[in-house]
């Protein structure tokens, strides 16, 4: 199935709020010929157009192998994570595709949604805040999203910060646990 029209959102602008309407030539020609009128506050605004241009440049630069590169970099980030966690003695597991992996404070992967209980969510939240405190950004669900611009420099960046984040999380959680006992 090929759509007649397609609307693309923020992804095409690398997170900048833009939208793109694209479609079959005969439909899009109606706009150019003046048969269809479209007006809006942000039509052709410079920031949005620049963001879209930058996204397309990045895609073109990595067009041959960007998924393989993302997975390779994320695999290296996982290796650094597990190595640091072992060194610190902090339980971590990684779930889901590497390009949008979730990190949990558990010895092994969660087998069901029931295992993602309040304790795990709380511990994941502490870890997430410690990540952020050390300059490692991740989503509210303790998820790390890859992008095609990641390089081994990002693995090095992660490696310089992850041990401190895990040590801080370990210290905070041990203090909290002592308070619970």
Features from the language model and the residues they span:
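Conserved N-terminal phosphate-binding loop of PLP-dependent enzymes in the Aspartate aminotransferase
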Residues: 1-181
């Amino acid at each position: 199935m090929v759509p007649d029209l397609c609307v693309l959102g923020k992804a095409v602008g690398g997170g900048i709020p833009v939208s793109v309407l694209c479609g079959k030539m005969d439909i899009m020609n109606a706009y150019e010929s003046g048969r269809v009128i479209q007006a809006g506050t942000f039509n052709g605004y410079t920031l949005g157009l620049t963001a879209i241009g930058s996204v397309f440049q990045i895609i073109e630069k990595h067009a041959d192998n960007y998924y393989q590169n993302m997975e390779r970099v994320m695999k290296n980030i996982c290796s650094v994570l597990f190595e640091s966690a072992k060194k610190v003695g902090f339980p971590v597991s990684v779930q889901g595709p590497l390009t949008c992996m979730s990190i949990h404070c558990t010895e092994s992967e969660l087998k069901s949604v029931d295992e993602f209980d309040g304790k795990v969510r709380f511990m994941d939240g502490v870890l997430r805040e410690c990540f952020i405190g050390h300059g490692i950004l991740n989503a509210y669900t303790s998820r790390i999203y890859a992008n095609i611009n990641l390089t081994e420099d990002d693995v090095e960046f992660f490696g310089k910060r992850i041990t401190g984040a895990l040590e801080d999380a370990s210290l905070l959680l041990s203090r909290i646990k002592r308070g619970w006992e």
